[in-house]
Amino acid sequence: MPEHATLPYVLERLTDAEALARAQALAGRLKQRRTCRDFSPAPVPRAVIQAAIAAAGSAPSGANHQPWHFAVIGSPDRKRAIRAAAEAEERRFYGTDGDDPKAGAEWLAALRELGTDADKPFLEIAPWLIVVFAQRKGGIAEDGQTQNYYVNESVGIACGMLLATLHEAGLATLTHTPSPMGFLREICGRPEWEKPVMIIVAGHPAPDATVPAHALRKKPLAQIASWL
């Protein structure tokens, strides 16, 4: 191993029983997470969102370059602009703009069980939109020149940690990926070497919020894991 600076790494040592209890408790809470499309406008403290993003920013990344940026939108005007641009793309996706849909018949059929359409009122109603950007270049210094590595993998892990932390904080979330979504770079004022990845909507669910029954169908552990 090449010579490099190091620091001690110490974790709390748990008994097997404690480790299992913690893992099962967290798994139980995360299994309650759902994608929410019915949000309340009730405010959420900025500090809660900041803490969740700080957790996401601790994710592992290629060469520790941390190739992500989280643009947090609370401004009603910017939320309105994002909704207008996103719904325009969604109308093209679903074919409700008068032209043939961009999405294939199989894709649209798969979405039918989730009840989605081109209307995205949650983009204005929820108190916070977190627009996640992947940085193709920049390194830790964000100089716009240094190459970043494993960008998609790194940003994906960070997004998962962000969603988990927001759920732990008692917030509902939704991931929205309009396609294309280049308009987000302009609205958020981000540089050209950053690529928008998704919008994470965060807030409290509306009192009458529902989720599709189909969303509760999860693959069993025996199907998603193999032991070799």
Q: Positions of the model-derived regions?
A:
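N-terminal accessory segments that position/regulate proteins before the catalytic core
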Residues: M1-C36, S40-Q50, R92
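Short alpha-helical scaffolding segments that buttress acidic/His motifs in well-ordered protein cores
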Residues: L30, A52-A56, I200
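Short connector loops at helix/strand junctions that flank enzyme active sites
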Residues: H65-P67, L123-P127, K195
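A glycine-rich helix N-cap at a beta->alpha junction
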Residues: R91-K102, G189-P212
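Glycine/small-residue-rich phosphate/adenosyl-binding loop
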Residues: P2, V72-V155
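C-terminal helix-cap and adjacent tail motif
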Residues: P2-E18, R22, M198-L228
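Glycine-rich phosphate/pyrophosphate-binding beta-alpha loops
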Residues: G57-N64
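Small-aliphatic-rich amphipathic alpha-helix that forms the alpha element of a beta-alpha
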Residues: A52-A56, I130, A134-I187
